[in-house]
UniProtKB/Swiss-Prot annotation:
Origin: domain of life: Eukaryota
UniProt keyword Glycoprotein present: no
Family: Belongs to the PPR family. P subfamily.
Organism: Arabidopsis thaliana (Mouse-ear cress)
Alphabetized UniProt keyword annotations: Repeat
InterPro entries according to UniProt: Pentatricopeptide_rpt, PROP1-like_PPR_dom, TPR-like_helical_dom_sf
Keyword Repeat: yes
Protein name: Pentatricopeptide repeat-containing protein At1g19525
PPR repeat feature ranges: 9-43, 44-78, 79-113, 115-149, 150-184, 185-219
Pfam family of the protein (one): PPR
């Protein structure tokens, strides 16, 4: 067989599966994987794992999960790394059904309780999917097992409450955590500032900004979007331009949604020239504005700042 080149072909196909999977080239990895099976070789756990992780890296967790089920049908055991990689992908996508499927598989394969990271990812997945009750139940179950939620996990649950505008539930959660001696950090404060800004609660948002500074942190970049929108909404020229200055300096970090939100807020606040300047930046990045923003840009300027975008002075 070696003389006919079968062994070398098998070795080559195996090496290609690992190589293409690590690089995220799932099309080539799949081709090498199918070639391997065509030689009559039964892929082992390592080859399956390489393929599954390759699909995850390529943003195709559903295909990876399909291979994991194929493994289980062949009585091959998936590693914890595989489960967690799939779960991270589903959490990032906000795919609650995908996360639930992985949860069932993990509980079936494991005799012990799930890890803190697993529960934290369930909170994230259900929260992003708008299934707040399930996010909270996983959060509570995690705490019953003795796990201490970190700032990211708390922020994901608060963000879920923000999605359904349940400020009372969020405040009860934070008060209970404070009572239990669990401190929140910059990530959670950032979610809260954005929430307060959206509600127009400027004083409350600024109090939270003070708490961020007391932690020795500058407001995160993404928070400048919220601040710019909040201050332009009340036509506070000084603070609008402060936040806008940070955004302009780091505009390469802005995505289409951030541009859309900021430009619309500037237009509504009467900062006409600033809005048009940001719109040009958006066009230069070849981002497609929303239909609403396109309509806003052809509408007549608002009364405030119709000439320069900044006419009157406001107290800071």
């Amino acid at each position: 067989m070696s003389q006919n080149g079968i062994f070398p072909d098998i070795l080559t196909a195996t090496a290609l599966v690992h190589m293409y999977s690590k690089s995220g080239n799932f099309e080539r990895a799949t081709e090498a994987f199918e070639n391997l099976k065509s030689y009559g070789l039964r892929p082992d756990e390592k080859i399956y794992e390489a393929m599954i992780l390759g699909y995850v890296n390529a943003g195709k967790p559903k295909l990876g999960e399909r291979l994991m089920k194929e493994m289980q049908a062949k009585e091959l055991k998936a590693s914890e790394e595989v489960y967690m990689a799939l779960l991270r992908a589903y959490a990032q996508m906000g795919d609650a059904n995908g996360a639930a499927g992985i949860s069932s598989s993990m509980q079936y394969a494991s005799d012990g309780p799930l890890s803190f990271e697993a529960y934290s990812l369930f909170v994230e997945a259900y929260g992003k999917a708008g299934q707040v009750d399930k996010a909270k139940s996983n959060f509570d179950e995690m705490r019953k097992l003795g796990h201490k939620p970190d700032d990211k996990c708390i922020a994901n649950l608060v963000r879920a409450y923000k999605g359904e505008n349940s400020l009372d539930k969020a405040l009860r959660l934070l008060l209970q955590l404070e009572k239990d001696g669990i401190e929140i950090g910059v990530i959670t404060y950032t979610v809260l500032v954005d929430w307060m800004a959206n509600l127009g609660l400027i004083e409350e948002a600024e109090q939270l900004l003070v708490k961020i500074s007391q932690l020795g942190e500058a407001p995160p970049f993404e928070l400048q979007v919220s601040l710019c929108c909040m201050y332009s909404g009340v036509r506070n020229e000084k603070k609008t331009l402060q936040a806008l200055g940070v955004l302009e300096a780091k505009r390469d970090q802005m995505g289409p949604n951030e541009f859309d939100k900021v430009i619309s807020a500037l237009k509504r606040g009467g900062f006409e020239k600033d809005a048009r300047r940001m719109y040009k930046y958006m066009e230069a990045r070849k981002f497609l504005p929303s239909q609403r923003l396109q309509m806003d840009m052809v509408a007549p300027p608002r009364a405030f700042g119709s000439g320069s975008g900044r006419v009157r002075r406001f107290n800071s």
